[in-house]
Amino acid sequence: MWRPSENQVYVPPPAPVSKVIPTDAYVKRTNIYYHASSSRLLAVGNPYFAIRPANKTLVPKVSGFQYRVFKMVLPDPNKFALPDTSIYDPTTQRLVWACIGLEVGRGQPLGVGISGHPLLNKLDDVENSASYAAGPGQDNRVNVAMDYKQTQLCLVGCAPPLGEHWGKGKQCNNVSVKDGDCPPLELITSVIEDGDMVDTGFGAMNFAELQPNKSDVPLDICTATCKYPDYLQMAADPYGDRLFFYLRKEQMFARHFFNRAGTVGEDVSQDLVIKSASKNTVPNAIYFNTPSGSLVSSETQLFNKPFWLQKAQGHNNGICWGNQLFVTVVDTTRSTNMTICAATTQSPPSTYTSEQYKQYMRHVEEFDLQFMFQLCSITLTAEVMAYLHTMNAGILEQWNFGLSPPPNGTLEDKYRYVQSQAITCQKPPPEKAKQDPYAKLSFWEVDLREKFSSELDQYPLGRKFLLQTGVQARSSVRVGRKRPASAATSSSKQKRSRKK
């Protein structure tokens, strides 16, 4: 008996899938280059927590283990005073910036910053146990300090970077949950903002939700969320706006090994141990280690050196859409925490007493960002405009382009007195002002709209660019020299000497 094939038949989609076009296909680069610098950027604060008396921040939290996300605001090239106005036609073309190089300058000396907790949940030293562990008491917390994992990171893109961390997930309705049960975990992807904590060696997780005892990790992260860059998600971005390229260096080793105090939620399986008559209870097996970033050296620095962008990893080859650029920096090799003391009395004491001095902690950071930008033009054909509108409609709106709405066949009602109570409530008018999509996010905004210069030989990064590319800088000073003698003058002098 004949039977039809039981294999599944896959029907192709009704319309072809749109293909992502790289920026090099419709962006034309010019031979005009500009240099921009942020000048010196400084930050000072407490490395562990912000000082907020009466819910007002007096001293911010500034740590060497925070992300520094710089939002660089660039000038509009279409309103820029260009040296050559014939490079593009404003009726059919628009200008954009392309980032072709940058140098992240870091000040301050190399140093290792430590963190800790005065009441850390540490029970036993399980690395070198001398005897059988005794049962934990009601409070076994001790004062412990440590250094963190070492990280150097630089992310560059025209959109904010993404980070990932583990948070508390949602429990299913058909699962009974008791107090003290381990919550489900969920991988959360969010935007990395300025001031977010990096992975310090204890995992990328929301410690406020998953460690409510506030004593399993040091002070600076016990109520915070440590994020790790979501490289997989940013690499899968179809347009490649979030990550042009990145620089990364991480290192860590385990320094000390401890275990936690508290009731063990999941006992060690009986198949894994053999008890004895005298030792019939299995000790606590909730182990953890204190991280360490080891040696910091100037030989392994990623900063204070130029990097040039020839080809980005995604489809966006350095084009700064929206006239903005995001630079995310992490540098834990300059995480020194300075201790400052102040005398409580005006007159200096004759003898030392520790109560007569107040101790404070501060961390300082110093940055200097330099960029090289190339001027580019885009010819506004119908295909290019349709593609840009699909990719990001805000680009065309910034260029004062709009799409006409489809014709409406219905008859609309418009009242004469809109604010009258005699008629039904009218819909509020739509907001005409363009909303910043990143208004609710926190970034370190740096205005570069008045920092562009075409005199490349006047800046360190500009001179490095001229040296590597071989482009000749325009000199505004002419060196005076004697005019060479003409051929007629020299021949007449020879004739006079012959007559003599």
UniProtKB/Swiss-Prot annotation:
Its main location: virion. The keyword Metal-binding does not apply. GO terms for biological process: endocytosis involved in viral entry into host cell; virion attachment to host cell. Pfam families: Late_protein_L1. GO terms for cellular component: host cell nucleus; T=7 icosahedral viral capsid. Keywords: Capsid protein, Disulfide bond, Host nucleus, Host-virus interaction, Late protein, T=7 icosahedral capsid protein, Viral attachment to host cell, Viral penetration into host cytoplasm, Virion, Virus endocytosis by host, Virus entry into host cell. Residues 473-500 are annotated as: Disordered. It comes from the Viruses. Self-assembles into homopentamers. The capsid has an icosahedral symmetry and consists of 72 capsomers, with each capsomer being a pentamer of L1. Interacts with the minor capsid protein L2; this interaction is necessary for viral genome encapsidation. Interacts with protein E2; this interaction enhances E2-dependent replication and transcription activation. Belongs to the papillomaviridae L1 protein family. This is Major capsid protein L1. It comes from Human papillomavirus 44. The lineage of its organism: Viruses, Monodnaviria, Shotokuvirae, Cossaviricota, Papovaviricetes.
